[in-house]
Regions:
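Feature of Fe-S/electron-transfer and energy-metabolism proteins
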Residues: 24-34, 52-55, 66-69, 83, ...
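FAD-binding subdomain of flavoenzyme oxidoreductases
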Residues: 103-110, 114-256, 467-468, 478-485
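Activity-critical C-terminal alpha-helical subdomain
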Residues: 420-485
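N-terminal flexible segment immediately upstream of the FAD-binding catalytic core
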Residues: 1-65, 81-112, 262-270, 313-335, ...
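C-terminal substrate-recognition/cap domain of FAD-linked oxidoreductases
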Residues: 20-38, 220, 226, 231, ...
Length: 485
């Protein structure tokens, strides 16, 4: 191996799946969120020293052993479908691209489980199951790109979660490589105090271990499916109907809502929304009787909440486009926003608060979301920005903090932490939960090798007291300057 390489043993292990090319490394400096380079440089060293692309669990373990011996920071990454820098390096180091850990899906019909490798995309996983008469229980709204391992390390709520629960509850067993390179079996649950459980990966964002295999509960492919698209006079009616249907039996497989602001944003991006009023998309699946009972519930909700059922063709189109929410970025150049976990009962209040903020700031803000658990929803509010203009971008960035303030007032919190949401740790979880998470991190990664700088504490620039003051000043400056910037 050439002497000039920083890590010759890794090059020998991986061959052309290891690179120190500046060009190739540069692609890993960002995720879905676009940040001006000068601002990114103030947060951390986002350019990895090298990129490793393992294909097997043994290669992952060997890489981690090497990194542990040298206290080399390792940032795990696959599709990087968030905008919080969960998978962006902060300390240079080694970027571990796990998208190559794919292979056949193994089905255990007796246990009704499937074993899958972490680089497998959720849409591919579900297609592999359906070819044999099975289906996943739930999947993320980014399923065409998001990987199994990535979602298991997030909070894990999405399409199907309302009916079947979060993905952590579907885990039977994991195989994972610890920070010291040890491959270990991780059961779905453990009675042993301090033991690592598969459910403990929820929200860990790649900071505890690297998942190398997962066994998940699956289901028989549904015999019937029914889609409904409803429109309502206001968000109070739309979210009221959503909460009513989510609490009724049978439980919908999918319950997605969008404020009229989202429809307006879609039009700006060149698309034609199904309606310009608040929308609610409901899907039932299962046996034909269950779907028929769901249809009956929808009819009652439409009558009770003064709604209107749109055509079956529009309902089918809405279902087919369920992964395309971010197409509104075409109104661009880009978008910023906030994703919150909110009580379903407060969705209308939240939407009203966001509408008032948009009017105050003179900026369109699109709001949409999904009811993902009994009484709870994930909600996204997005607004346009231009990262090529640093000052307007910085002023616009303050609105994300304002959106979270609206969520906090209505019992919400950020959904996901990464780097950009670390200023809100005190609102995102209790002091006891944060202390427990930090203790778990110290136990399983005492050298802080895996994904350093994420989840547990903010970087200096995002320290909460100064961050809050800075964002308030920027928001005020933006409000004053909106006519000329």
């Amino acid at each position: 191996m050439p002497d000039e390489l920083a890590h010759p043993p890794l090059a020998e292990l991986l061959g052309d799946r290891y690179t120190e090319s500046a060009f190739e490394r540069s692609f890993y400096r960002r995720d879905l969120g676009v940040v001006p380079p000068r601002l990114a440089a103030l947060i951390g060293d986002t350019l990895p020293q090298a990129v490793a692309r393992p294909r097997t669990a043994d290669e992952v373990a060997a890489i981690l052993r090497y990194a542990a011996e040298r206290r080399l920071a390792v940032t795990p990454r696959a599709a990087a479908t968030t905008a919080y820098w969960n998978a962006v390096p902060l300390a240079g180091g080694l970027l571990l691209d796990l998208s190559g850990l794919t292979g056949p899906v193994e089905i255990n019909e007796a246990r009704l489980t499937a074993t899958v490798l972490p680089g497998t995309r959720w849409a591919e996983f579900d297609r592999a199951l359906r070819r044999r008469g099975f289906a996943v229980l739930s999947y993320p709204t980014s399923a065409p790109a998001a990987t199994v391992g990535g979602w298991l390390c997030m909070e894990g709520y999405g399409i199907g979660s309302l009916k079947y629960g979060g993905v952590q509850g579907q885990l039977r067993e994991l195989e994972a490589a610890l920070a010291n390179g040890q491959l270990t079996r991780v059961p779905g649950a453990s009675e042993k105090p301090g033991a690592l459980r598969a459910t403990g990966f929820a929200g860990s964002e790649g900071t505890l271990a690297i998942i190398t295999r997962a066994e998940l509960v699956i289901r028989r492919a549904p015999a019937a499916i029914g889609h409904h698209l409803l429109t309502f006079p206001d968000m109070a009616a739309a979210t009221g109907a959503a909460a009513e249907l989510a609490a009724a039996r049978p439980t919908p497989f999918y319950a997605h809502f969008a404020a009229e602001s989202y429809s307006r944003f879609l039009r700006r991006a060149g698309f034609t929304p199904a309606a310009d009023s608040p929308l609610l998309a409901i899907t039932y699946d299962g046996d034909p009787d269950e779907v028929a009972r769901g249809d009956h519930n929808v009819g009652r909700a439409v009558a009770h909440w003064r709604g209107e059922a749109l055509s079956a063709a529009l309902a089918q189109r809405e279902w087919d486009e369920r992964f395309l929410a971010l197409r509104l970025k075409r109104a661009g150049p880009s978008v910023l926003g906030a994703e919150s976990w909110l009580p379903a009962a407060r969705l209308a209040d939240y939407a009203d608060g966001v509408a008032k903020l948009a009017a105050q700031q003179g900026l369109p803000i699109a709001t949409y979301g999904t009811i993902v658990a009994p009484g709870w929803a994930t909600v996204m509010s997005l607004y346009g920005c231009d990262e090529s203009r640093p000052l307007p971008y910085l002023l616009a960035l303050s609105l994300t903090k304002k959106l979270y303030d609206v969520a906090f007032r209505h019992g919400g919190r950020p959904y996901g932490i990464g780097v950009w949401n670390t200023p809100y740790l005190a609102q995102a979880m209790s002091a006891e939960e944060l202390a427990m998470r930090r203790a778990t991190k110290r136990t399983f990664d005492p050298a802080n090798i895996l994904n350093p700088g994420k989840v547990y504490a903010p970087p200096r620039l995002l320290w909460p007291p100064t961050f809050r003051l800075g964002m308030e000043l920027l928001a005020g400056a933006r409000r004053v300057s909106k006519g000329w910037l």
